Every structure is written in structure tokens, then in C-alpha cells.
Amino acid sequence: MNYTGAIFDMDGVLFDTERIYQQTWHELAEEHGIKLGGGFLKAITGTNGERMRRVVEEYYQVSDGAAVAEECMKRMQEKLSECVPVKDGVREILAFFREQGVRMAVASSSSLRQIEANLAGAGIRAYFEAVVSGTEVERGKPAPDIFLRAAEQIGCRPEECFVFEDSENGVRAGHGAGCITVMIPDLIEPSDQVRPYCSWICRDFFEVRERVNTNVLS
């Protein structure tokens, strides 16, 4: 297995933020007098921009989904300003890849300001040579654009880059980019439909490091 790069999603992969994210969506839903089901959370995870707007308008039954999404992001950032919870194994895998000379990037649907704030708050910004926001590409996940851009920015071929994702939209994007796509499920287990798009499915980054060390591809 040849790999020269590693591209990380942010929410649910680097940081244990998905629960905060979901809680905030539910708070907003209650204010709009609606009850969200699991379908919304699955549809919204990993999206941004126009796709996020459409999902919000469909489930919230509002005419301005962009405004609701903006309010959600604002509230979430306020919560994260107090503490950015780093997921188990993240610091270890970053140090491991750095020792190996692997070039690393973050590719997240969140705004660049939010990504930079979270990375700095967690003290891990220095590991990454590039940070790509969903606002920088024409098409958001599940389109592959964000991972192709990240691979380009760190000077690596997509097929030689790991992509670490927790969402089905992200997995489809990583696979579409031709990357070695690793799903680390957070709150949503992989469906039978998305499993074929995963190179690996790992419980955490400790398992990722073990597989990389032993060259286990399946």
C-alpha cells in the first residue's frame, strides 16, 4: 500500500462534535415547532452550502434554509469556544503520520473560520499543511471536489491519500476522489449501501494505526 497523504474530515472525526451539532439542530427544530427524525441527521451530516439549504428547507419547512443553517453554525461555535473535544487516538495518529513524513490536510464542510478556530483551540493546527473548507469548492460532499482540492494542496495524488470520514456523504466523496477511504463511524453506523465505498471501516484511530503498521487492507 502506497500512501503519501492523509486528509481528515473535522466534525465526528478529529473532534467529538457531532453530538453538539445534533443537539443544536434539535434545539432549533423545537423553536420552529417541529420534531426531527434520524433521516434529517443522516441527510445533513457532511453537507454545506446549497445542499444543506435544501435539506433544512425540506425538513424544517422554512423558506430560508440558509438562515437557519447559519444560526445553527453560530450557536455551535459558541459552544465549542469553551472546549474543543478531541477524539480518542487523534493526537497519536497525527504524530504517527508526521513521523512517517505523510502530508496532512483537513477537508471539512464547515467554514474556514470555524475549522481554524477548532484546530487552534485543540492545539493541533501545526500538523496540517492545508485546510480546505466546503465554501471553497463548487460542489459539496458527496461530490469529490473538496478531497481533490485537498490532495492538490498537499501535493499528493488522490489515490495515495487516506481520507478519514464518519459520514456517508463524506465516504462517497472520498471514494469518488479515488482516495483510500476509511470510515470511522461516530453516531451513525455505515449502511449496506455505503460499505462498498469504504476501503476500511475502523472503530477508531488506534485501529487505523494498527492496520497501517501491518498493511492490512481489508
Language model features with spans:
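N-terminal helical cap/lid subdomain that shapes the substrate entry/recognition surface
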Residues: 2-100
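Short, flexible loop segments at the rims of nucleotide/cofactor-binding pockets, characterized by
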Residues: 80-85, 109, 178-181
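Functionally critical, cavity-lining and gating residues within the transmembrane helices
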Residues: 49, 108, 112
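Conserved catalytic-core motifs of eukaryotic protein kinase domains, centered on the activation segment
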Residues: 19, 108, 117
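Asp-based, Mg2+/Mn2+-dependent phosphohydrolase catalytic module
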Residues: 1-4, 95-98, 111-218
